[in-house]
Amino acid sequence: MDAAGFFQRYVSRAHRDARDIGCTLAALGGDATRQPEAVRTAFEAGIEKLLEILVRDSTLSRSGSPEQARIRALAMLVQAVGAIVMSRACPDDSPLAEEILEVCRAAILGSLGSRPAANEHPDAGLEPT
């Protein structure tokens, strides 16, 4: 999956609603700040691994130097995680919860030069099992 596909699915209602199987960063990132250094180091390693994967995406890697690709990937990842956290903080049926996801997803995909496919809903294939 390329970066656009990852963010299309990550910043979605299905991911937001899948609290039990969703991203550890979004679910526990706030709690990690109060944990021992070993836990925070594990979170850091997970973030680094995800950044490595995103930076390898051709859309990001051809945008300049590896450092520039990393900066872009980090900015998008932080925006995506923040979108999930803030959307989850709202009631599930809140218009604001959905707006947060829509605005952030569009901004991230726009920065990648991508838009959702007309026939692909961001929640496709992400129904909790």
Feature roles, as predicted:
Residues E37-E44, S58-D123:
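Hydrophobic/aromatic-rich alpha-helical bundle segments in the mid-to-C-terminal region
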Residues I47-D57:
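Active-site oxyanion/phosphate-handling segment shared across diverse enzymes
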Residues M1-G22:
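Hydrophobic alpha-helical connector segments
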Residues D123-T129:
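Long, low-complexity, intrinsically disordered segments
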Residues D31-A32:
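Well-ordered alpha-helical scaffold segments within catalytic/enzyme domains
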